[in-house]
């Protein structure tokens, strides 16, 4: 088996699964009220000419939601609390996180073995996450290494999210990615790494190779899963 392309999940694979839920999500909800308070509600049709990126994102919500900043906050907080993969939410989160990274509030705790792999794998690496592509680029652009912020994006070939590839538990999403990266005729040369069993199963159904990455804090695997799928605990274990 010759692998020349690796697709990486983010949460629970290259960084702790707790980073998103314990750091990024709370940061978003902390900053959101002050941002919403600066916007005039209800959003009128005249807002369509406003080039404020926040307003342009919020305009995609149903009018029944954008009647007040309280209703918008309640709606978005519910999506966050339920961990619903909503594209509008992801866009807004990406914008707010960008500001957090820029001012140094946020740094991404990428695992050391993941940084090492990304920096030294001399073939193609793609990212596929439910988080927006913008959020992915921000995260890898502000990876923490030796207490400094480093940019890993130059080592990455491209990015996919639920708006460009589809949901990660669907095999057709991986087939779409194979087409996008010109690997539809050679899917076995592609390896997808994820902490999620359903994602790994879907990737395998597309013809890719796929391993489950076991990290501290990840959901425990059943004995059946451990016997069915190849597992690794670190990207250092890869021999490609």
Curated annotation (Swiss-Prot):
Enzyme Commission designation:
3.1.3.77
- Just give the chief location class: cytoplasm
TM ranges are none
Q: Which InterPro entries match?
A: Enolase-ppase_E1 (IPR023943), ENOPH1_eukaryotes (IPR027511), HAD-like_sf (IPR036412), HAD_sf (IPR023214)
Q: Which reaction is recorded as catalysed by this protein?
A: 5-methylsulfanyl-2,3-dioxopentyl phosphate + H2O = 1,2-dihydroxy-5-(methylsulfanyl)pent-1-en-3-one + phosphate
Q: List this protein's GO terms for biological process.
A: L-methionine salvage from methylthioadenosine
Does the keyword Transmembrane helix feature in the UniProt annotation? no
Record keywords, A-Z: Amino-acid biosynthesis, Cytoplasm, Hydrolase, Magnesium, Metal-binding, Methionine biosynthesis, Nucleus
Role of this protein: Bifunctional enzyme that catalyzes the enolization of 2,3-diketo-5-methylthiopentyl-1-phosphate (DK-MTP-1-P) into the intermediate 2-hydroxy-3-keto-5-methylthiopentenyl-1-phosphate (HK-MTPenyl-1-P), which is then dephosphorylated to form the acireductone 1,2-dihydroxy-3-keto-5-methylthiopentene (DHK-MTPene).
Assembly and interaction partners: Monomer.
- Protein's name according to its UniProt entry: Enolase-phosphatase E1
Q: Where does this protein come from, organism-wise?
A: Candida tropicalis (strain ATCC MYA-3404 / T1) (Yeast)
């Amino acid at each position: 088996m010759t692998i020349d392309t690796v697709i990486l999940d983010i949460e629970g694979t290259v960084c702790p699964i707790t980073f998103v839920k314990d750091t990024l999500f709370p940061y978003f909800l902390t900053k959101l009220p002050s941002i919403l308070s600066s916007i005039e509600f209800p959003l009128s049709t005249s807002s369509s000419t406003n080039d404020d990126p926040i307003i342009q994102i919020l305009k995609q919500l149903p009018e029944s939601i954008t009647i007040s900043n309280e209703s918008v906050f309640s709606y978005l907080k519910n999506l966050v609390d339920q961990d619903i993969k909503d594209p509008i939410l992801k866009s807004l989160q990406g914008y707010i996180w960008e500001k957090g990274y820029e001012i140094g509030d946020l740094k991404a705790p990428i695992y050391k073995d993941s940084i090492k792999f990304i920096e030294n794998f001399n073939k193609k690496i793609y990212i596929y996450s439910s988080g927006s592509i913008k959020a992915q680029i921000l995260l890898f652009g502000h990876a923490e290494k030796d207490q400094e912020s480093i940019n890993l994006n130059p080592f990455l070939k491209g990015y996919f999210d639920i708006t460009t590839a589809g949901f990660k538990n669907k095999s057709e999403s991986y087939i779409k990615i194979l087409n996008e990266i010109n690997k539809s005729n050679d899917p076995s040369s592609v390896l997808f790494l994820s902490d999620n069993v359903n994602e790994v199963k879907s990737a395998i159904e597309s013809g890719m190779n796929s391993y489950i990455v076991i990290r501290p804090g990840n959901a425990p695997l059943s004995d059946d899963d451990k016997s069915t799928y190849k597992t690794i605990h670190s990207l250092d274990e890869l021999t490609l």
